[in-house]
Amino acid sequence: MADNESSEKKRKKLSRRKFLVRGGFGTLGVLAVGTYLFRNPIRRTILKKVNSMDIEYLGSTDNPMLWFELGKDNVVILHSPKVEMGQGTFTGIAQMAADELDVPFENVKVVHATTDTGNIDQFSTGGSTSISGLWQPLRELAATFREMMKIEAANKLGVSISQLSVKDGVVSANGESLTYVEISEGVTDWTIPKKPILKDISSYRFVGKPLPRVDLADKVYGAPMFGLDAEMPNMLYGAVVRPSKIGAKFISATTDKAEKMPGVVKVVSEDDFVGVVAESYIEAENAKQAIEVVWETPDNLQQDEIVAMMTVGNGTSSIIQKQGAALEGDDVVQMEFRSPIGAHAQIEPNGVVAYVEASKATIMISTQVVGITRKEVSSRLGWDVEEVNVIPTYLGGGFGRRLHTPHAVQAAVMSKAVGKPVKYIFSREEEFQHDMFRPPTHHILKGSLNEKGLLSGLEHHFVSGDVGNNSALLPNVVPTILGADVGAIRGAFIQYTGVPNHRSVYWHVDLPFATSWWRSLGLLANTFAIESFVDEMALKAGKNAIEFRLAHVNDDEAGKRLKEVMSTAGEKAGYSEEVKNGRAMGFAASVDAGTPCAHVVEVSVEDNNIRVHKVTVVLDPGLAVNPDQIRAQCEGCVIMGMSAVLFEQMKVVDGSLTPTIYGPYEMALMKHAPREIDVVLLQGKDTPGAVGEPPLGPIGAAIANAVKRLTGKRLQSMPLKLT
């Protein structure tokens, strides 16, 4: 029913200035403040705002026709600007839309918005912002759509709007009824009300219910829905030659042998890459191996050099949080912690199909940044963005990996060279060796106790490589303005603001390999360090770990929510600091993107291996749009966090990142999963909050704290190993 021409015009009216104003993202909104940003107190205020991830939806919210269309049987098709990567966003937004549209939940069909036919988010899908960011605009759009139906129904039925009632997508008055589809027939000029009236949340039928996933059947039956499934008629296959050494620069390539191999259509040589296009995937991969490339490589790096590089005191520093005086004196306790390089290791490797025609390019891809993918392809082709249509697919795991899509550009270049669609799939080796890794970190924690056994001071000094810096999501000026990487500082703030003297100091080091976004960003490593140290201070003070923490949390709104999460976790888990039957409990808590979370774990040691038996998760996500999906996210965070904390690490060996395949890259297996994950949800506010990443934060420290009580050993480096 949407008027595509008028919709496109309305989308183009969203000027750059309006985009920045609507964005609400502190990083963008502060640009007008100018030189005041370079004053440290203001910087720290902005960093705190950015760290809360209070990001509004960055896209058009004034035209329901970009979002909704009507299908047969009165089905409403919702074009989602957020991609589905297993987090359940499609289900949550279907619930939100159904309530305000006043249609049955099963009558809402959610599809990915393409850049040609729907509204797209100019930011990304990530940062735990999909449901929280769409909560207000999507409901308003749905309410507007409902009111548009009522206006036209009143015209067709010859009654006033006040005489109408709406139920299940049917508008009625005086014994006559019209479905939304019947109302829309023949209407070309819609009246869009300026201010929709939202329903009272208490009247919602679907929000707050544990409804089944809308994509469940497709996944069970194996529908072709992922990037690797994407196909186009007459499709060829591409492969790209990549260096095995860190920092290698392309010099030249000899392609004669590859050009003569079976199935090869063309070898595409560019200044920045060499690719092969062939009739099959295997033929493209085989020909790639036959290309002789000359690389300029630096001296072979080794792991110990990376460790030395990633040490507090190296690089540039910025104070991101400061209250009171710095810690000095003989009574100051100091400990160090480290986390390793981490891979995304998502199940589905990156894949893309690109078809570049004379004046139109079509890209089918697993991407978390639909708009950025479009801009990068159009820029490389030298075209206007309107000439590139990006069709996002379902993602077989995102975790931040698909915030980078240079392979879309490479596939487009290869397609243009051969005049046919080209499918480019990463091999597993490519996926591991050329990942955008989670950077390694080093932390120094300092603390002191007063005569009452309470913290008089707490400091966190840490170093990290790039997370948000140098990514397409953030303008290059942002690091200069903020003085810190907005991703690296996630979880780095001292949440125990009742400590009179506390500070957090960030150090940045440029690493020789690519690092970037990884699920929860800096939260996992920062929480591991801070919460392990706080637990050590509780032991030193001779106090219960939970009670010790509660004594240092303020009673503002955020503090009260954190306290409630901590207390509830202890109660639900039956937290005890006694070792019973060879098992011990550990506790940790964190606040991420405004969502507090606490874990209590129960562990044992079997053959010098740490075994996690039970995890109790207490999360306060605010209003739970779909409680079952939130529990699933908590369970997923526990398993992913356990895997990272107990097993995963990449290393630099002779100038290369290794390993490059599952198996040697250790990950948690089914046998390592806890027998029980108990999730308790609280509601400390009346709107949805972040969910996809906050539950990942506490797991590492909780395990380490349990191991300390069980064995007496303080494990200070991930992955946690007793030998």
Regions found by a protein language model. Give the residues of each.
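Cofactor-binding beta-sheet edge motifs in enzyme active sites
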Residues: A2-T723
